C-alpha cells in the first residue's frame, strides 16, 4: 500500500492508493481529493511498471507542481518509509527533531517538536504536542494555530514532510528520510486493513463456577453424660447400722465368730462403697470432658466446611459478577467471557446491585433443642456457629430481570448511575443478539447516557434505530413499533399455549422507563401496566418515591446515596436488604462501550452446508457456454433417469432431484414461507431440467396464481409450453379443459403407436418411428393454497388428472407458503417427494414432513428433501439462479464515496454529495444467471432450428385483438364488382377442447340478425365499429349501405363519414327516426316486389339472376335499451320486428347491442338468430342470452361468448392497432379519407332532415327565391318530411294564422323579403290593424291601420273587384293582405257575399287576397265571414299543433310535440305537413 500526502495553499490531504485504481484531485466536490482554488485537474494512475504518476509525470517520492496560488506538493510514502517506536518508559516528555540529542532524530526537520503526557495516555487518551511558531503542524490534516495542542489516540500529525500517528503504546512514523532513535521499535511493517474477521467474536465454552448448594447439617451435641446421683452416706450408713446392731447384739448376747463375721462384712461394704463412689465420680468427669472436646472439634470442622462453602459462593459471585473495573479489563483484552451468558443459562439477565450481606446459596441445617431444664453449653456453641454463618458477608448482591417489573427509587442522578452499571454488566456478558435496551427518559438526561450509544445493545435492530425515547419524534418512531412487537409476542404465546410449548423470545428487551409522561398517552401504556416477562420484555421503572410506582412492580430498589442502597422487595417479598453500590468514578464507561461496539458477534460457526450457492457454482462453471447444453441434450434420456442437480449437501456434494416414476417422482410438494426461497428453488429446478433435457423431452406448464411473476421469468424458455396466471372460475375450467385435451391427445398418440407409457414413446421418438414430440409435462403451481381456496374444484380435478397422467408423462409439483389445512390426504398420497424450506411454524413442518425440522430453518434456500416414507431425508442448500451473471468473471465494483454521519437516532445520514460519479456514467445492468442461461438455451434453439412443441395450453385470449391480425383489411385489395356473400370476422375465438385459437367468422346468411348483450363499458360499441369496418373494407359503398342508430353515448359518431353510411341517428331525433322507419318500410315493400316480380326467394338470387347491384342494408343499433320509453318505441319496435322477420331474405340485416335481453320484445328477440353475451353484472342474464354455458364471460373489456352448440368464447376485434402517433379518431379519419378518395361511385342517400336554422338569405340564391316570387308565389320555408321549399301561391287565396303577434311580425318579415319584386308585379294594399306590417307602410301602394282607413281598403277592394269584373284583368294584379282578419270584419262589416266573391272570383281577375290573424281569435270569433273564408280557402299556414287547431278535423296525434318558434303546418287539400319558416 502507498500513502500520498497532498499539500496546497495550507490545505493538507492524505490518500491511500490502491493498485490498479485511478484517482482525481481537483476543486470539484466529486473528485477523490478536493482542494479549493486548485485551478486544474490532476489524474493519478499507475503506469505499466506500477509507478504512480500525476498527469503522466512520475512521482518519485516528492513531486512539486505549480498551482494558481501555491505550489502543489505530492509526497509518496511506501512500506520502506514506515517505522513504529514505543514511548520512553521513564520520562513523560520526548522530542522529535534534527538534533542528535532528540529522542527521535530526523535530519530533514528544521525545528523540533515536543510530545508530552504520554505516560497517562491510557487514562486521558491523548498526548500534548508542543511546537514553535515557525513550524506548521497539522493535526488530522488541519493546520493548528495554537502552539500546544492535544492529539488523541488514532490522530494523525504532519510536520514538515513527517507523518505521525498517535497510538496508545507509541508513535507510527512515515518519513522519506532516515529516522534514528534509541527508542524501542514496535514493528517494521506498515499496518494494513485488518482481515475481514478481525473484529468477529465467537463465544467460547463458558466456565461456570457454581455456588455451593449442598446442605450442611450441624448435628446436635451427643446426649449429656448421666451423673450418678447416689450420695456416699447411702453406701456407708447401712453397714454402719449393721455394725452398730451387731455390737448391741453382742452386748446383749455375745456370739463370738458371728459378730466378727458381721463386722468384717460391714467394714468391707463401707470400704467398697466409698471406693466405688469416688471412682464413678472420676469417670463421670472424664466423660464430660471428652464429650465437650469431641463436639467442639466437630463444630470446628463444620465451621471450616461452612467457611469453605461461603468462600466458594463469594468466589462464584465475584467471578460471575465482577466489578466494572474488572469488566473494563475483560473487554479491553477481548476475553472469552464476553457475551458468555445466553437465554438458556441460569443467570441470564442477572446483574450486581452492590456489596451486601447476602443469603447463603446452601442450607445450613441445625435443629435447636426445644426444651431442656438443664443448660448444656454445647448446644449454645452449636447455635452460635449456626447463627454466625447466617449470611455471606460483603458479597455481590444479585438482582435479575426475569421475574417481573423492577423499580428504582431515589435521587435521579444516583439511579442513572446505577442504571449505567447495569448497562455495562448486562452488555458485557450478554450478546446484542440476545439482549437490547430501550430507554424512555427525559431529554435533559440523554447527555448522561450518551456514552451508551456506542453499545450495540442500544440499537433496536428490528427498527434500525437507537433505543432512546426522549421526545415526541422518537416516541412515535419507536414505541409504535415496539407496541406491535409486544402484540405479536403475546399472540404467539396464546397460540403456543395450546401445545404447552414454552417460547423463548429473542432478543430480550430491557425496557427502562425513567419518564412516564412520554408514554402516558401512547397505546403502549396498555402493555406497560402489566408484567411482560413472559414475552421476553423486562420492565424497569424509575421514580422519586415508592408511592409513584405502578402497582405491578415486583422488585423495588431504593438508592439512598452513592454509598448506600436498599433492596426493599424482591419478587413481591419484603427483604429490606441494605447494600453498598459500586463506585465507578474512575472507570471510562465510553471506552468499554466503544470496545464492545467493535465486536461483531458471530453466533454460530459456519456449517458444512454453504449459506448460499449460485446456479452456475453448483454446475462448477463460470460461463453458460461451459454448461455444454447441446451435449447434455444429446446424452440424457428421460426414460433412463430424470435426475438433475438441485443444490448441495456440502462442498462438492451435489444433491439431485429425480422425478422419474421409479425414483423420486412423478409428483411432489414444495413448502416455504415468504422469503424462504420457495420460488427460487422451483426456478432452479426448471432451469436445471431445461439444461439437461431437450425441449422435446421436457416441457413446463406454469400455474402462477400470484400473478405471473415466475411465468414472466421463463417466457423466452423454449421448454415453456404455457402459463396460467390469475385464474378465475372460467380460466380455471379452461385450463383444466386444455390439460384434459392434452391427455386425450397423448392417449391417441399412444394408441397409434401401440404403447402405453411415455418412456416407450420416447424410445420410438428417438428411433424416428414416432414423429410428433411429446415431452414430459411438468405442471407447476407456485401457490396452490390460494388456488385451492379460490378454486377447490379445479384443484381437485388437477390432482386427479395428474394421477391419471402418470404413465402419460404428466408431473405435478405443488408449492405453497403454508401447508397447514391445505395438504389433504389426496394431495399427500399423490406426492412422493417433498421439499420443505423455512416454514412458519412446527405445525406447517409436521404437515409436510411429519417432523418439526423445517420450522428451525433460518437461511433462505435451505431445505429438506424427503422422498417416500423417509426413504431419503436430507438437508441441503438449493442453488440460487438469481445471482448476477458477469461473463468476465469480475463483479462490478462501485466505490461509494458518500460520507455518512451516524445521527442521534443511530441511523446513517449522508453529509456530502454522491461522489461515486455514477451520475456521469451509464449504469450497467447485469443479467441474472437465470436470464443468461435462458438466453443461451434460446440461442441454441435458434441455431439448431428446433421445432416448437405443440402447446397444450394456449395463452388466454389477449385483451387486445386487431382485425388486421385476423383478416385482410386493405379495402383496395378487397373491393370488387362481384357481389360477395357477407362474412363477418368478429374477433379471435378460443376453443380449448380443440387446443385452437383463430378468427371468429360468421356467414351472415347462417348467422342472421345479431344481438350482443353486455354491460356498458365492456366493448359493445367497439363490436359495432369492428363490424362496420369489416363490412366497409370488404364491400364497396354501392354494395353495402349502413344505417347507424346511436342510442348510447355517441360511440358511433366517429364512423359516420364512412362512405357506406347512409345516415346516423340519435335517440332524440324522433322525427328523423320516424322518417327512417317510413323509408325502411318502403324499401322492404320495394324489395318484396322485386322478389315477386322475378319469382326468386332472396335478393342474392336476384343478383345472380339479373346481375343488378342491390346493396346489402345493415341496420346497426347501439344500446337498444334506450328505445324503451322513447317517443318512437312502438313504431320502432314494430319496424324492427318486421325487419328481423322479413329482412334477411331481402339482404337487410340488423345488428344491435343492449344491456339485457328483455330490452327487446319477445318476437324480435326470437328473430335474433345469433346472440352474443359479453360480461354482465347479473350473472344469470348470460344464461338468458346463450343458454347453459360451460364458461362464464370474463370481466374483461371485449370478451364475449357466442351462442352455439359449444358456446364459443372470443375476444372482439378492433378495427385499428394502437398507434402512438395517432389517435383512434385520426386513424378512422385517415381510412375514411382514403376510401372517399379511392371510390368515385354512388354512395347511399341520407335521410333528409330539417336544419336547426334556415335563413332566407342562405337559400335565396340556391333555391332561386326571387324568381319564385316573380312567378306569383311567396317562399316561406322548408317542410320537415322532404326538406323541400314550401310556398304560398298568391294566385290562390290563403290564410296564415299563428299563436302570437310576434310570430305574425316574423311572417310579415318573410313575406316582404322580396318587396321590390312584389311591387313590380302587384299593387299591394295592406290592412294592418295590429301593426305587424307597419314597417312596410311606405313601401306599398296602400296601407291602412286606422279604422277609417281600413274601411277605405274594404271599399277599394270591392271597387277593384267590380272594375276587374267589368273591364277584365288589369295589367297589374292586386295583392290585398288583411292582417287581423277579425278586426277587419269588425271595422268594415264586410258581408259574407263579398268575402265569397273575393275568394272565388278575385284570383281569376288578378285580385289576390291573403288573410293573416291570431289563431285563437279566428277560432273564438262568431263571425260567419271567417267561417266562410276558412271553408273556401285551400292554402293554410297554421302556427299551432294539429291536435290543438280547430280549422280541420284530423286524426289525433299521440304525444304531438309543441310547435317551436318559426314552425307551422301547411294544410292543403285536407292534408298537412310540418314546415319551418325562413328566418
From Swiss-Prot:
Transmembrane feature ranges: 230-252, 257-279
Topological type in the membrane: Multi-pass membrane protein
Keyword ATP-binding part of the UniProt annotation: yes
Any GO CC annotation of this UniProt entry: plasma membrane
Keywords on record: ATP-binding, Cell membrane, Membrane, Nucleotide-binding, Repeat, Transmembrane, Transmembrane helix, Virulence
Principal place of residence: membrane
Role, per record: Component of the type VII secretion system (Ess). Required for the secretion of substrates including EsxA and EsxB. However, unable to support secretion of the substrate protein EsxC.
Protein name per Swiss-Prot or TrEMBL: Type VII secretion system protein EssC
Domain of life: Bacteria
Domain FtsK: 652-846, 997-1183
Similarity section: Belongs to the EssC family.
InterPro entries for this protein: Firmicutes_EssC_C, Firmicutes_EssC_N, FtsK/SpoIIIE/SftA, FtsK_dom, P-loop_NTPase, SMAD_FHA_dom_sf
Amino acid at each position: 500500500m502507498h500513502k500520498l500526502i497532498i499539500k496546497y495553499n495550507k490545505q493538507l490531504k492524505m490518500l491511500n492508493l490502491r493498485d490498479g485504481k485511478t484517482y482525481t484531485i481537483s476543486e470539484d466536490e466529486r473528485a477523490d481529493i478536493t482542494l479549493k482554488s486548485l485551478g486544474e485537474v490532476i489524474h493519478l494512475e499507475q503506469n505499466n511498471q506500477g509507478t504512480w504518476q500525476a498527469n503522466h509525470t512520475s512521482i518519485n517520492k516528492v513531486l512539486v507542481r505549480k498551482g494558481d496560488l501555491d505550489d502543489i506538493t505530492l509526497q509518496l510514502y511506501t512500506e520502506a518509509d514506515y517505522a513504529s517506536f514505543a514511548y520512553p518508559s521513564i520520562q513523560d516528555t520526548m522530542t522529535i527533531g534534527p538534533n542528535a540529542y532528540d529522542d527521535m532524530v530526523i535530519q530533514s526537520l528544521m525545528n523540533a517538536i515536543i510530545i508530552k503526557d504520554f505516560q497517562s495516555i491510557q487514562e486521558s487518551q491523548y498526548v500534548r504536542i508542543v511546537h514553535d511558531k515557525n513550524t506548521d503542524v497539522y493535526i488530522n490534516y488541519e493546520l493548528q494555530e495554537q502552539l500546544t495542542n492535544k492529539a488523541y489516540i488514532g490522530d494523525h500529525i504532519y510536520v514538515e514532510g513527517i507523518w505521525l500517528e498517535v497510538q496508545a503504546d507509541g508513535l507510527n512514523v512515515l518519513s522519506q528520510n532516515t529516522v534514528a532513535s534509541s527508542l524501542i521499535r514496535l514493528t517494521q511493517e506498515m499496518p494494513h486493513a485488518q482481515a475481514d474477521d478481525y473484529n468477529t467474536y465467537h463465544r467460547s465454552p463458558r466456565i461456570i463456577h457454581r455456588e455451593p448448594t449442598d446442605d450442611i447439617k450441624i448435628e446436635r451435641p451427643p446426649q449429656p453424660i448421666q451423673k450418678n446421683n447416689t450420695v456416699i452416706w447411702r453406701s456407708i450408713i447401712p453397714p454402719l447400722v449393721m455394725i452398730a446392731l451387731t455390737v448391741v447384739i453382742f452386748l446383749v448376747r455375745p456370739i463370738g465368730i458371728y459378730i466378727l463375721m458381721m463386722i468384717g462384712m460391714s467394714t468391707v461394704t463401707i470400704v467398697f462403697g466409698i471406693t466405688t463412689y469416688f471412682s464413678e465420680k472420676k469417670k463421670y468427669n472424664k466423660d464430660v470432658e471428652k464429650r465437650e472436646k469431641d463436639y467442639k472439634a466437630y463444630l470446628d470442622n463444620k465451621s471450616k466446611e461452612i467457611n469453605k462453602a461461603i468462600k466458594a459462593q463469594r468466589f462464584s459471585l465475584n467471578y460471575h459478577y465482577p466489578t466494572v473495573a474488572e469488566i473494563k479489563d475483560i473487554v479491553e483484552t477481548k476475553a472469552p467471557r464476553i457475551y458468555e451468558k445466553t437465554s438458556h443459562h441460569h443467570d441470564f439477565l442477572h446483574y450486581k446491585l452492590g456489596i451486601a450481606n447476602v443469603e447463603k446459596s446452601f442450607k445450613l441445617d441445625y435443629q435447636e433443642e426445644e426444651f431442656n431444664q438443664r443448660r448444656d453449653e454445647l448446644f449454645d456453641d452449636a447455635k452460635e456457629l449456626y447463627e454466625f454463618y447466617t449470611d455471606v458477608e460483603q458479597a455481590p448482591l444479585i438482582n435479575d430481570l426475569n421475574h417481573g417489573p423492577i423499580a428504582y427509587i431515589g435521587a435521579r442522578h444516583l439511579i442513572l448511575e446505577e442504571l449505567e452499571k447495569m448497562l455495562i454488566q448486562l452488555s458485557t456478558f450478554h450478546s446484542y443478539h440476545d439482549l437490547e435496551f430501550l430507554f424512555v427518559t427525559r431529554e435533559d438526561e440523554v447527555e448522561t447516557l450518551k456514552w451508551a450509544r456506542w453499545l450495540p445493545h442500544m440499537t433496536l435492530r428490528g427498527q434500525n434505530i437507537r433505543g432512546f425515547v426522549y421526545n415526541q419524534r422518537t416516541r412515535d418512531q419507536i414505541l409504535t413499533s415496539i407496541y406491535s412487537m409486544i402484540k405479536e409476542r403475546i399472540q404467539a404465546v396464546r397460540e403456543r399455549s395450546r401445545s404447552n410449548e414454552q417460547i423463548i423470545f429473542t432478543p430480550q428487551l430491557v425496557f427502562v422507563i425513567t419518564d412516564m409522561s412520554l408514554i402516558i398517552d401512547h397505546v403502549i401504556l396498555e402493555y406497560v401496566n402489566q408484567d411482560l416477562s413472559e414475552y421476553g420484555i423486562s420492565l424497569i421503572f424509575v421514580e422519586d418515591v415508592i408511592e409513584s410506582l405502578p402497582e405491578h412492580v415486583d422488585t423495588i430498589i431504593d438508592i439512598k446515596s452513592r454509598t448506600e442502597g436498599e433492596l426493599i422487595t424482591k419478587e413481591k417479598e419484603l427483604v429490606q436488604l441494605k447494600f453498598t453500590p459500586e463506585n465507578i468514578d474512575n472507570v471510562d464507561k465510553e471506552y468499554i462501550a466503544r470496545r464492545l461496539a467493535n465486536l461483531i458477534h458471530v453466533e454460530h460457526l459456519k456449517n458444512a452446508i454453504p449459506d448460499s450457492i449460485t446456479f452456475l457454482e453448483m454446475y462448477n462453471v463460470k460461463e453458460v457456454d461451459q454448461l455444454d447444453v447441446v451435449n447434455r441434450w444429446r446424452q440424457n434420456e428421460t426414460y433412463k433417469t430424470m435426475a438433475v442437480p438441485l443444490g448441495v449437501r456440502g462442498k462438492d456434494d451435489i444433491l439431485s432431484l429425480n422425478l422419474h416414476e421409479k425414483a423420486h417422482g412423478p409428483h411432489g410438494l414444495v413448502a416455504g414461507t415468504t422469503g424462504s426461497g420457495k420460488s427460487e428453488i422451483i426456478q432452479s429446478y426448471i432451469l436445471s431440467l431445461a439444461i439437461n433435457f431437450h425441449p422435446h423431452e421436457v416441457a413446463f406448464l406454469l400455474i402462477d396464481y400470484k400473478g405471473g411473476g415466475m411465468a414472466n421469468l421463463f417466457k423466452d424458455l423454449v421448454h415453456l409450453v404455457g402459463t396460467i396466471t390469475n385464474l378465475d372460475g372460467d380460466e380455471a375450467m379452461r385450463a383444466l379443459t386444455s390439460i384434459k385435451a392434452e391427455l386425450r391427445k397423448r392417449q391417441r398418440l399412444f394408441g397409434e403407436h401401440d404403447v402405453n407409457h411415455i418412456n416407450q414413446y420416447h424410445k420410438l421418438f428417438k428411433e424416428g418411428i414416432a414423429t410428433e414430440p411429446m415431452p414430459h409435462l411438468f405442471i407447476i403451481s407456485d401457490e396452490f393454497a390460494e388456488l385451492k381456496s379460490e378454486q377447490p374444484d379445479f384443484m381437485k380435478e388437477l390432482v386427479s388428472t395428474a394421477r391419471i397422467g402418470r404413465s402419460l408423462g404428466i408431473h405435478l409439483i405443488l408449492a405453497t407458503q403454508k401447508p397447514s389445512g391445505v395438504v389433504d390426504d389426496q394431495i399427500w398420497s399423490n406426492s412422493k417427494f417433498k421439499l420443505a424450506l423455512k416454514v412458519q411454524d412446527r405445525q406447517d413442518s409436521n404437515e409436510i414432513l411429519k417432523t418439526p425440522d423445517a420450522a428451525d430453518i433460518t437461511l433462505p434456500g435451505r431445505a429438506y428433501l424427503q422422498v417416500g416414507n423417509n426413504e431419503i431425508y436430507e438437508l441441503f442448500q438449493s442453488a440460487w439462479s438469481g445471482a448476477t451473471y458477469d461473463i468476465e468473471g469480475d463483479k462490478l465494483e462501485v466505490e461509494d464515496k458518500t460520507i455518512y454521519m451516524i445521527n442521534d437516532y443511530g441511523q446513517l445520514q449522508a453529509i456530502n454529495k454522491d461522489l461515486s460519479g455514477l451520475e456521469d456514467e451509464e449504469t450497467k445492468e447485469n443479467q441474472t444467471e437465470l436470464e443468461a442461461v435462458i438466453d443461451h438455451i434460446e440461442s441454441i434453439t435458434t441455431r439448431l432450428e428446433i421445432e416448437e412443441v405443440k402447446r397444450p395450453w394456449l395463452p388466454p385470449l389477449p385483451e387486445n385483438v386487431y382485425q388486421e391480425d385476423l383478416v385482410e383489411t386493405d379495402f383496395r385489395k378487397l373491393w370488387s364488382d362481384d357481389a360477395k356473400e357477407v362474412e363477418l370476422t368478429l374477433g379471435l375465438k378460443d376453443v380449448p377442447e380443440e387446443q385452437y385459437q383463430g378468427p371468429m367468422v360468421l356467414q351472415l346468411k347462417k348467422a342472421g340478425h345479431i344481438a350482443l348483450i353486455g354491460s356498458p363499458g365492456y366493448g359493445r360499441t367497439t363490436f359495432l365499429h369492428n363490424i362496420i369496418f369489416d363490412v366497409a373494407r370488404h364491400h364497396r359503398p354501392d354494395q353495402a349501405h349502413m344505417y347507424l342508430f346511436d342510442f348510447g353515448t355517441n360511440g358511433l359518431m366517429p364512423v359516420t363519414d364512412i362512405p357506406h353510411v347512409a345516415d346516423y341517428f340519435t335517440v332524440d331525433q324522433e322525427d328523423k327516426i320516424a322518417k327512417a322507419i317510413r323509408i325502411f318500410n318502403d324499401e322492404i315493400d320495394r324489395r318484396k316486389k322485386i322478389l315477386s316480380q322475378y319469382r326468386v326467394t332472396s335478393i342474392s338470387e336476384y343478383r345472380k339472376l339479373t346481375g343488378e347491384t342491390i346493396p346489402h342494408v345493415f341496420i346497426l343499433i347501439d344500446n337498444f335499451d334506450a328505445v324503451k320509453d322513447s317517443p318512437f318505441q312502438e313504431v320502432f319496435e314494430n319496424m324492427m320486428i318486421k325487419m328481423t322477420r322479413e329482412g334477411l331474405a331481402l339482404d337487410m340485416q340488423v345488428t344491435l347491442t343492449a344491456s339485457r335481453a328483455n330490452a327487446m320484445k319477445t318476437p324480435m328477440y326470437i328473430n335474433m338468430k345469433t346472440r352474443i353475451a359479453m360480461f354482465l353484472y347479473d350473472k344469470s342474464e348470460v344464461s338468458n342470452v346463450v343458454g347453459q354455458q360451460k364458461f362464464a364471460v370474463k370481466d374483461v373489456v371485449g370478451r364475449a361468448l357466442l351462442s352455439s352448440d359449444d358456446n364459443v368464447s372470443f375476444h372482439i376485434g378492433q378495427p385499428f392497432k394502437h398507434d402512438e402517433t395517432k389517435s383512434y379518431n385520426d386513424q378512422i379519419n385517415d381510412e375514411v379519407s382514403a376510401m372517399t378518395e379511392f371510390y368515385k361511385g354512388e354512395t347511399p342517400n341520407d335521410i333528409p332532415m330539417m336544419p336547426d336554422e334556415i335563413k332566407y338569405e342562405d337559400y335565396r340564391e340556391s333555391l332561386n327565391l326571387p324568381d319564385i316570387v316573380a312567378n306569383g308565389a311567396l317562399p316561406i320555408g322548408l317542410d320537415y318530411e322532404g326538406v323541400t321549399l314550401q310556398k304560398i301561391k298568391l294566385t290562390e287565396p290563403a290564410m296564415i294564422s299563428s299563436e302570437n303577434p310576434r310570430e305574425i311580425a316574423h311572417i310579415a318579415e318573410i313575406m316582404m323579403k322580396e318587396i321590390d319584386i312584389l311591387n313590380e308585379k302587384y299593387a299591394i294594399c295592406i290592412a294592418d290593424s295590429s301593426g305587424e306590417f307597419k314597417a312596410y307602410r311606405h313601401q306599398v301602394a296602400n296601407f291602412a291601420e286606422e279604422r277609417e282607413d281600413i274601411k277605405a281598403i274594404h271599399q277599394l277592394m270591392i271597387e277593384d273587384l267590380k272594375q276587374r269584373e267589368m273591364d277584365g284583368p288589369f295589367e297589374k294584379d292586386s295583392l290585398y293582405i288583411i292582417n287581423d282578419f277579425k278586426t277587419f270584419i269588425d271595422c268594415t262589416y264586410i258581408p259574407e257575399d263579398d268575402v265569397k266573391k273575393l275568394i272565388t272570383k278575385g284570383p281569376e281577375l288578378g285580385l289576390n287576397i291573403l288573410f293573416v290573424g291570431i289563431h285563437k281569435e279566428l277560432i273564438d270569433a262568431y263571425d260567419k265571414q271567417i267561417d266562410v273564408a276558412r271553408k273556401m280557402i285551400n292554402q293554410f299556414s297554421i302556427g299551432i299543433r294539429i291536435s290543438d287547431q280547430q280549422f280541420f278535423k284530423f286524426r289525433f296525434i299521440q304525444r304531438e310535440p309543441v310547435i317551436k318558434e318559426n314552425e307551422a303546418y301547411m294544410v292543403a287539400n285536407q292534408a298537412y305537413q310540418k314546415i319551418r319558416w325562413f328566418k
